[in-house]
Amino acid sequence: MGSNEEGNPTNNSDKPSQAAAPEQSNVHVYHHDWAAMQAYYGPRVGIPQYYNSNLAPGHAPPPYMWASPSPMMAPYGAPYPPFCPPGGVYAHPGVQMGSQPQGPVSQSASGVTTPLTIDAPANSAGNSDHGFMKKLKEFDGLAMSISNNKVGSAEHSSSEHRSSQSSENDGSSNGSDGNTTGGEQSRRKRRQQRSPSTGERPSSQNSLPLRGENEKPDVTMGTPVMPTAMSFQNSAGMNGVPQPWNEKEVKREKRKQSNRESARRSRLRKQAETEQLSVKVDALVAENMSLRSKLGQLNNESEKLRLENEAILDQLKAQATGKTENLISRVDKNNSVSGSKTVQHQLLNASPITDPVAAS
């Protein structure tokens, strides 16, 4: 309704300015602080009726002194769901008893359930609903399904009320020229559009199998009502509920993802193992090189020791040969001295017995 309050004074102020334009063609008086006025009053506050753009600007009263303008038309539409009773017997006259085809919800609901497409007389909708609800109140099994259905219809009526309010605001802002004929015509059109849907719910409810008062309701008694209640829920949450093929796709994707994760883990594990092995190989190669260097040093030392040993052996051999030569020379000297003494003794003894022996 704020758009009505905002749009009416501007149009009313523009009309006299347009009418006075031919008369005051040479007079051009404008409000110098128009931007300041717009910033001061804001977009949601209507301009006072006594304000004229062709007159000189004067001191305007503060906004809190303005009286709130009366609404152009009385509010109408369905009340909010908390104000409606759970059973739906004492419903507001403006509330429609049946589900209203509006948007994709009505299309999905009509596609799921066939009782919504059956036409029923709209003149006795309230009386038939009242009597039918009295009959259905005796059954305990159908009470919950009916209340669920009424809750769904109340939610859709509240959504329709909000959409009707938005359309009403648009219509009133577009046609706020002092006449309310456009708003009344749009209201009548909406009422005519909503009137055929009022007879749909009794037809869907009359399709339920009724039993006697003494008979207890079976489990199957609530099944015909479930499509009308569940259709809205399915249509509202159709995107959230996965289909069977969607579940298969999701499972397949999960399986593929798990396979990818396992392959990635195995690849990372193998990569870590190869890195560890490469580190071990590098360590072993370094150790082998160090051992080879030590072995070369030991070979050099052993060669030096062998050469020293050979030199020592040569020296020992030389010393041994010198000693033996000295010994032989000494023996020869001793033998030569003893032989000469015996020869001299024999020559000195001139006896015939010893001469041949000495000669021999």
UniProtKB/Swiss-Prot annotation:
Comp. bias (Basic and acidic residues): 246-264
CDD domains assigned to the protein according to its UniProt record, in alphabetical order: bZIP_plant_GBF1
GO cellular component terms, A-Z: cytoplasm; nucleus
Localization in the cell: Nucleus
Gene3D superfamilies recorded: 1.20.5.170
UniProt biased composition (Low complexity): 164-184
Residue spans of biased composition, Polar residues class: 1-16, 198-208, 335-352
Top-level taxon: Eukaryota
Summary of the tissues where the protein is detected: Found in both light and dark grown leaves.
Renumbered residue ranges of the record's region Basic motif: 251-270
Disordered: annotated segments: 1-26, 150-275, 335-360
Molecular function GO labels: DNA binding; DNA-binding transcription factor activity; sequence-specific DNA binding; transcription cis-regulatory region binding
Main localization category: nucleus
Region (Leucine-zipper): 277-312
Binding partners and assembly: DNA-binding heterodimer. Interacts with GBF4. Interacts with BZIP16 and BZIP68.
The protein's role, per its UniProt record: Binds to the G-box motif (5'-CCACGTGG-3') of the rbcS-1A gene promoter. G-box and G-box-like motifs are cis-acting elements defined in promoters of certain plant genes which are regulated by such diverse stimuli as light-induction or hormone control. GBF2 is found to bind asymmetrically to the G-box.
Protein name in the entry: G-box-binding factor 2
Organism of derivation: Arabidopsis thaliana (Mouse-ear cress)
